[in-house]
Amino acid sequence: MKKWQLLTVSILGLGLLGGCGSQKTRGNQESQGLEQKIAVSVPTELVTLDTTQTTDKNTFTIAQHLFEGLYRLDENSVPIPGLAKEAAEISQDGLTYTFKLRADAKWSNGDKITAGDFVYAWQKLVDPKTAAPNAYLLDSVKNSQEIRVGDKPVTDLGVTAIGEEEFQVQLIYPKQSFLTLISIAWLAPQNQAFVEAQGENYASDSDHLLFSGPFVINDWEQGSDTWTLKPNDAYYDRQEVKLTEISGTTIKEENTGIDLFNTGELDLTKLSGTFVAEYADDPSFVSHADIANTFLDFNKKPGTPLANENLRRAIALSIDKESLTKHALNDGAKPLNGLIPEKLFINPTNQEDFRAYSGDYLVYNKEAGKAVWALAQKDLGEEIELPLLVSDDDSGKKISEYIQNQLQENLPGLKITITPQPRTNVNQSRRDKDYQLSISSWMAGDNDLGMYFILYETDSAYNYGSFSNSSYDKLAVSAKTTNANDVTKQFADYQAAEKILLEEGIAQVPLFQSASNYLINPKITGMEYPSYGNYFYLRNAQLTD
């Protein structure tokens, strides 16, 4: 029996913005005699809490606790009204959404949250001056795309405040996942007067933020290793928030988390590799599949080795994903041979999963890889050296060392140099396109297939690897506009786009679909694991006897 003395939560995650469901609770009755305080460890510092700029899922997990929007996800990842007081009114053609806000929706300073706060936040997101990496999220909103490229003013965005408590959105095409999309903190409101009063200091630390979610953050500034979450006393559903304090700190070493869990100093920590098998029968073990793609990304900048298609194809065919997941990781991850992970989207007309529909690409083929490698050597020379950018945590170490060994063994003359960096630096290097090979992952904000294909659209802020193909772009646009209401045609568009991306362009090498594995103190109940957006959610969590 473990002695639960210091109660701590540890988050360890791979990549950018997995599973679903929640622990069974014992009702909403607060346990008597237990101090409702926990601590949280994260593998990297929080990058930015400006919701227009947040991209990594680790930071976003905390942001989701601080900023609530019109809707939020329930324990089954179903969108339900948040700051909206009731379900949205949707026009028959699916193009107009009208939301009525809660009269008691307030900012953490007590000011009323208004429809104008949503207008401001959404306009700010698509404003080219903001340079928001997530601006594409509103591409379904009228005039958003034209505003993003500077062809129209932000005031033309299809959003309207009808008084203080009614917010209306005009779409250019129906979007089945729209309510899920607006449940993510990227589209939470911002208080214009407050933001502008802070100037460049907005979101630089906890003193220069306002909060609309169940918690506020204290004692945080960019780059700091520690911070504290406390209940937002102005939150409309304050009585449902049981935890009184969540202390956060940065811990990178998985071994450390497991050791502290076993001594009772942590009450939730993530597992991977051999630890999963070791603890699989432990009553505290919890596992669920992530809807995510972990991949090897190529920077195809002209004039660099990886601009060579033969080199990219040789690398793609020379990685044994079965061995990677079974031996190097051994944590429940599954090989992935496509851009889209399993269970992201299922065709409601025939229950066919897109991954099964689209088929497999870049499957391990050692001999074919060697043949293409010989062609690459004719183009580039016998000896080629490539740096591999990875995060400096346990997962990054395991994956990169496996890939290094596999490629150097299967492709004689290729040298892979691992360059580990803190995850925040990795993300910045990718944004700056300052890499050649990198390990990354993508976990979309909702179940829209387009959330993955946006990664490689020519003008996408996430297109770090300089992939560009006009046919791919046309198919991606057709799928989310012309064929948005016909899933069968949409599937066909996306399948053709995926083939161009992987079979023809070799833009990335899909590696695996990850699993999240935890040891959890059974005294924590009500903890939720959303399918989209964040790793977990503590709004309804509490400690029980």
Q: What are the language-model segments listed below?
A:
Residues 41-92, 210:
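N-terminal lobe/hinge region of extracytoplasmic solute-binding protein
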Residues 171, 175-241, 245, 255:
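Gly/Pro-rich hinge or "lid" segments in bacterial periplasmic/extracellular proteins
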Residues 234-278:
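Ligand-site clamp/hinge motif
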Residues 361-362, 413-426, 453-521, 545:
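Extracytoplasmic/peripheral linker and loop segments enriched in polar/acidic and small residues
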Residues 518-545:
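Long beta-strand-rich cores associated with HINT superfamily self-processing modules
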